[in-house]
Every structure is written in C-alpha cells, then in structure tokens.
C-alpha cells in the first residue's frame, strides 16, 4: 500500500504513484498473485507531480528491497532469485496493462552484469587485507519512455555530403546521456565511428 502526498495541486498525482506499482511489479513475471493499492492525498505542501523516474523509482526501491529480504530468508543468492523469477521475453505481464514482453533481454543483461561485476568472487562479502569489508548488491529496474500504445518516438538519420550522418531525435539530454547513447547505437548499426554521427 502506498500513501502519496501530492501537494496542493492535482498535477499527475494518481498516475505518478500508480506507476510505482506498474513499473515495479512486472519485473517479476513469475508472480502469480500480487496486490497494489494506493491513495493520493492533497495537502498544503509544494506540488509533487511528475519528475525524474515518474514514480517508478519509489516502487522499485520497495520491491527490490523486499526481494533482497526474501532472498536472505530463503538463504538464496539475491542474483539467483532474480534470475529465476524475472520477466523474460514472450512472457505475459498482467501487472503491466496486460502487455507481453515482446522485446526483453533482461536475463542476458543480468547474466552479463554478474560476469562483469565478478559477483561470484565478491558475494556475499570480501574481507580486504586491511580488514575492511567490501560487498556487492543488485537491483532490477525498468523505465518505459512512453505510455503503452499511446506515445510513439522516432529518429531520423540523413547522410550528408561530407560523409557524416546527421541524427534528429526528439529527446532532450538533461544529463541523462541520451545524446551519447543514441549516437553510439546509431554508430553501431551503421558500422561507423562515433565521430561520424552528428
């Protein structure tokens, strides 16, 4: 249950807190039962509408903390419990508007994270020569960039006379790195250097 203080104005109160459940619960497609309830209250406080993460971050924090606690109670590796229960490609997601995960490589991504982080060597903890303890942690998250079946996005790439590709996108880079990331994706698809994308 979530009680959300949305401030003195309507803003996006219900949709923001609603997404805290709809973006967190579907991460675990094997869940056969779930319940998500919330209330939004209006108070004489500053407006608390949509902002970075649009509600998803709060729900993901709650779910992922619970999964870690569950793994501890079961005596399981937190990485393993996620690998066994996370949503996989082709899986129906009743908690996400009845959508099917048609494009999902979360399992491959998490396997790569496990490998690159040296999880097996570092979990549950590693005692350093100086007596300090180091450990690793894991959490899953998903954040869509639109409202399913409503919002659409596109990118246009044109090849200039100088041999440089000009990419036009409708995304504003507000510190998220999307300009770099999208240029890297385009360079990989076009088999060219990153400097060839403008």
Which ranges hold each PLM region?
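Molybdopterin (Moco) oxidoreductase catalytic core of the xanthine/aldehyde oxidoreductase family
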Residues: 1-21, 73-111
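Gly/Pro-rich active-site capping loops and adjacent beta-alpha segments
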Residues: 1-57, 130-198
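Helix-loop-helix junctions that connect adjacent transmembrane helices in secondary transporters/permeases
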Residues: 85-164
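Stable alpha-helical structural segments in soluble proteins, enriched in small hydrophobic residues
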Residues: 58, 62, 66-77, 109-120, ...
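Short, surface-exposed acidic
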Residues: 76-80, 121-124, 192-196
